[in-house]
Amino acid sequence: EMQRSLVGSEMCIRDRDIEAFKKAHAQREYGFRPEDNRMAFLDELEKAVFFFDGALVTSGRRNPAWGTTAFTLMELPDKTKPGAWSELYKDKIAQAKIEAGRYEKIVQGIRTAEAEALRNRYTLQVYEQTNNLQNYPVRLILALNAYDTAKDDAAREAALEKVAEVCSYFDVMRSNLESVYSETRFMEQPEGFISDLNHHNHLASKTNNSDWWYYYEIPMVKKVRAWMK
């Protein structure tokens, strides 16, 4: 009897398509009614990863699935050549504008989900902080674009202040993210930790603290701050 029950359950699972699984997950994990589609933002959050993953570099990779490599950061605007930077990175800028809209859509979706969830709100907090992290390169690229295309000195000065704000926001974003993640994860290796000796080039093996989470962002912020001086 138990075997028949297990087989029946397996067949039921096999008969479900991806959308049915999503609805069942939303109902089971958070108590949402399937027809409300409260987890639609998760699809957008997954799409945002693709731009985030390489937004700040022109070569290299940090995808854990493929191993990490050396990388080259984006160049920064030249005050003597206004508009040249924006032309060079026009594709990144265009996508960043799309991602900015996606970010706001995700923010609204998470807010609604947090307000209506019957349980498991912690996971929604993780999604919220992940969204903020993935949006960081978008903020920085658009701020640099505003500086590069400023119409006069006053506008350029205001844009430069915005770039500085985005650099400062990185520390706030990181602190908020790690405050949430640290509820269930260690943020650094213990003293005396011995790194992997199997020669695998894992992203998580790059640092003994959480710096590897921001493999491109930390050096890019450092580069921008030096450029502003």
Regions found by a protein language model. Give the residues of each.
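Single conserved hydrophobic/aromatic residue that forms the stacking wall/gate
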Residues: 1-8, 12-13
